[in-house]
Each structure stands twice: as structure tokens, then as C-alpha cells.
Amino acid sequence: MAGLLHLVLLSTALGGLLRPAGSVFLPRDQAHRVLQRARRANSFLEEVKQGNLERECLEEACSLEEAREVFEDAEQTDEFWSKYKDGDQCEGHPCLNQGHCKDGIGDYTCTCAEGFEGKNCEFSTREICSLDNGGCDQFCREERSEVRCSCAHGYVLGDDSKSCVSTERFPCGKFTQGRSRRWAIHTSEDALDASELEHYDPADLSPTESSLDLLGLNRTEPSAGEDGSQVVRIVGGRDCAEGECPWQALLVNEENEGFCGGTILNEFYVLTAAHCLHQAKRFTVRVGDRNTEQEEGNEMAHEVEMTVKHSRFVKETYDFDIAVLRLKTPIRFRRNVAPACLPEKDWAEATLMTQKTGIVSGFGRTHEKGRLSSTLKMLEVPYVDRSTCKLSSSFTITPNMFCAGYDTQPEDACQGDSGGPHVTRFKDTYFVTGIVSWGEGCARKGKFGVYTKVSNFLKWIDKIMKARAGAAGSRGHSEAPATWTVPPPLPL
């Protein structure tokens, strides 16, 4: 009996061990559940579990409320949600001038650095010289984060500390209208309106593609002799209208022939090229000329008291090609006779020489081998990129030179215009920026005119004009190197 009981118990135990816990195969409609991830919504105590960013919003789409559960901070939630909802609006760095971008839903917000405002921090709230010249009529400089305006000789700052008001009847850098015009302190009555000029459209010019061959001496032909036969002249352009080129001076030799140009700086001083002083032993300076074959009553010839040539002038390279003439008698400013303004160095280089164009004038030849022009001509020429200028030239372009002109249009300075003015207009006032120096031919394709860069010599010019003409002690001055020469008297 006992043996039978043990047998029954053993069979029962073995049967329980050998019976499977469940079916090995599941029905088709239940098989997909084996690898299915359990959702939080279906998990135990869902609402009391701490939020998880990956589980809530990356593994599946989440709501703003679910994102808020993750961060438990309104600012962090908003920052995440703005990117999560529609992408990062700050990805393109829309905020300018070091502004900080904050992403939003379908938008962004810029926090601007000090001194800037606007949707993209694009507007400056402070005046700077690089933005509209700081609002200044003429010279602009920045001191202690503030703009300081100043004016050329013959002007004073207006009550607004921005405008420049003339204190002279014929202020520098202004076109003259003649005797009938009224004189007043306001500069608008002292000059022709610029809209009356027939300028080329600067928008059609490319400083690096349109180049002009403004030349002094033709470097590929024999150098100029005593008669000045190889000096530079204007090709193309147009006649200077009444009062348009009042700062033009003409150097005239003993044969009463013009051989070089010059720029009137004030009643006693005229700026020209150093190489012009090698073209004639004796010469006078004529001002007021618009037609050398007609007398209009404004012409006047002045004898030269002293010539001041830069002592570092190099005849072979035309480096330091600059000279100043002091006249024996003062120039009387009148119709067609007025000075051009001298700029400040930094302002000239940052503002004037970054303009699109300048103006050159003279009585030069009308083409490379043509006759001299009897009428004063002017030509608007674009500034040329320095690297383009250097690549186009067969000769060295030194730091004391710059290029201007066209490479395709048949317009240029040519033989006879050497030493003449290159001026740049800024707000209807004209400032001296260059001296016609040299070039390769006249209006040759792909060649540029080369000018003396006046901004490099402004201190030198200033010291020359402040010195007494007969001051022997000024000769060889270290700060104003120059060769002082008193020309022989002209024959009666």
C-alpha cells in the first residue's frame, strides 16, 4: 500500500515537471506583441514618474505639456519647444553686428549689442564715420566713441556741429558762378548746383574693370626734353563749363606754350608734378584760362618766386612726383579762379579715395599724337583697384601712386596735362586727391593713368606753405624734405 502511494506521488511530480509552461508558438494576431515597446501611458503609476526627454519627445511625438514635465522650467521648456516644433530659426545667424539670436516659434528675436537696433540689429544708434561720414559735411574722425566733424580752410562748423559754413567769398572746392552772383556766408550761394554738371553715371563704371590711362610722360618712348613735348594731356572728356574748373593752373614756358598743369591751393601756392620742373627753365603760371586762344578777362599770369620740389623725387620711376610753386604776387580769386580744398590724410584715404570717381582736367592733347587743346577739358575717371593697377603696368607702382581711368573707353589724360589736378567730389565740395603724373600712351586699352597720391604728402605741403619763401633754414628740413629753387628772372 505504501509502495503504491509513493508511485502515485512520483508520477504526479514528474508530470508537473514535464508539462510546458505555455505554448511555444503564439497565434498570428498576437505574435507582433513580442517585440512591442510598452508605452508609458500603459505603464503603472504613469503620472507619478519623472519626465524623460528621450522617452517623451524623441522616441515619440510629445506635447508642450509633456515637454514641460521633462524640464519643469518655463524658460528651458520654451527654448526646447521652439526648436522642436519648427526647427532653429537662428541657424542662419540673422542677427548682425554681434547681436545674440533667440529662437522662437516661426520667428526669432535679436538681442542687439550696444549701439545697434532693429529686427536684425542692422541700424546703428551711434554715429560713426564709416556710416554716412558720421553726418559730417567734410572731415570726420572718431574720438572716444564719438564723431568729431571739422572743415577745410575757409570754412567753420555750423551750429549743428556737422555742417561746414564758408567764411570766404570764394571758398575752396566750389564752382564759381561769376560776378553777378551774390556772396553770402552760406556755401549754397557760392557754388553751382552739382546737378547742372554732365557727369558720367558712376553706376555704369567698375573701378576694377574700367581703367584709364592718365599719363604724364610716355614711359615707352623717349623721355621729355627741355621743351616739354612729352608731357600729359586730356583725351576725350568735355570742355569745362564756366566756373567748373576754377582751380586749374597752366604752366607756360618762354615760347608762351603751356607744358604742364597745376592746382591752385591758395592765393600764393600752386601744386604740380616734380617732373614738370625739368620741362622748362623759365615759366609763368596762368590762372583763369578756359581757352588759350581767347581772352575772357579773367586770365592772369603770375611769376614764380620759388619752386619747391620733393628731394626724394626719382626721375627714372617718377616716385615722389610732387612740387609746390610759390608765386610772387597773390592770386585774386574771381570767376573761373578759386582754390581746391586740401583734405585730411585719414579722411582722404577712408572717404575720398573710396568714392567711385574723381575728375581730372587740363589743356592736353586730344589724342596721343594730336595737337594741343586750346580749351580746358575735364574728364570723370573711376578709381582703379590697386592690385589691378599693378598687374596692368609695365613699371613699378609705388605706395606714392594710385591709378584711375578706363580700359576700354577712348578717354584719358595725355601729353601736356602732367602736374594737373585730380580732385574728388564729396557733398558738392572738391578736394585735391592726386597729381597727373605718368602713363603708358594715351587712352591705350588695358592701361591706367598713374597719379601722385596727395594724401601721402599733406604734412609736407602744409609745412611748405607755412614756411617763408626765402627761409634758407627750411632747406633740407627732415620733416619736409624739399629742394628749394629760385628761378631766374623772365626776360622783359
Curated annotation (Swiss-Prot):
Disulfide bonds join C57-C62, C90-C101, C95-C110, C112-C121, C129-C140, C136-C149, C151-C164, C172-C341, C240-C245, C260-C276, C389-C403, C414-C442. The active site is at H275 (charge relay system), D321 (charge relay system), S418 (charge relay system). The modification Sulfotyrosine is found at Y200. SMART domains: EGF, EGF_CA, GLA, Tryp_SPc. The vitamin K-dependent, enzymatic carboxylation of some glutamate residues allows the modified protein to bind calcium. GO terms for molecular function: calcium ion binding; serine-type endopeptidase activity. The modification (3R)-3-hydroxyaspartate is found at D103. Residues 86-122, 125-165 form the EGF-like domain. It comes from the Eukaryota. Residues 234-466 form the Peptidase S1 domain. Its EC number is 3.4.21.6. Residues 472-492 are annotated as: Disordered. Belongs to the peptidase S1 family. This is Coagulation factor X. It comes from Bos taurus. The lineage of its organism: Eukaryota, Metazoa, Chordata, Craniata, Vertebrata.
